[in-house]
Amino acid sequence: MTKLTLSALLIALTAPALAAASGDADHGEVLARHWCAACHIVAEDQEHGADNVPTFSAIANKQHFDQAGIARFLQDPHPKMPDMQLSTYESADLAAYIETLKK
């Protein structure tokens, strides 16, 4: 296998992982408003959320916020959260959106 072929193969295999890691914040906002807004306040224009549930802004502004960690968490959420069965890409998109709420 030539170096060029090997390089092309490595790029092809890692591109989806890199895309998932960065996420699409605009799509993440759409997902947040659809899946998460019943409990979490996901945007500044939202007035109501469930009691004792952090807002997305509060999550984004935690001292140790980690976009990749949030994306992993969404793949296997805690028992109080519904299992939305998000794809890796959708989890990355939601995490990217939450990242935009940092102040």
List each language-model region with its residue ranges.
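Sec-dependent signal peptide recognition
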Residues: 2-10
